[in-house]
């Protein structure tokens, strides 16, 4: 989850941008809550999309099946949008139960020379 942790899979620019988006979302809520404007930072872990094919060691089909799916993210966005006006979901983390970063598999996707 690049918006929460620094890691080698996503790279410097992507991770920095994700951190900035979280700060922007918090700033929107801070500056505009009195106007009824709200923002939610949706922070997904690994989502099974084609972008994973660009990794040096793409995850297997079995690993992808265990990841958050595009439909899961869509359902979460709908949930956020359907909240009543008096509710602000500031930040939501959505990760798979079988989380590769917890079990160390994500670290194996980065080739290391050490």
Identify the residue ranges that each predicted region occupies:
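Catalytic loop of short-chain dehydrogenase/reductase
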Residues: 1-20, 26, 30-33
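C-terminal helical subdomain
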Residues: 41-42, 61-103, 107
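Short glycine/proline- and charge-enriched loop/turn segments
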Residues: 52-62
């Amino acid at each position: 989850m690049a918006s929460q942790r620094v890691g080698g899979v996503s790279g410097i620019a992507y991770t920095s941008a994700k951190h900035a988006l979280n700060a922007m979302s918090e700033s929107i809520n801070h500056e505009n809550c009195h106007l009824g404007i709200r923002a939610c930072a949706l922070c997904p872990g690994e989502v099974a999309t084609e972008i994973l094919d660009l990794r040096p060691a793409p995850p297997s089909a079995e690993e992808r099946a265990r990841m958050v799916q595009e439909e899961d993210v869509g359902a979460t966005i709908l949930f956020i949008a359907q909240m009543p006006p008096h509710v602000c979901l500031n930040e939501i983390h959505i990760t798979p139960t079988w989380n590769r970063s917890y079990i160390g598999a994500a670290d194996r996707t980065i080739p290391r020379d050490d």
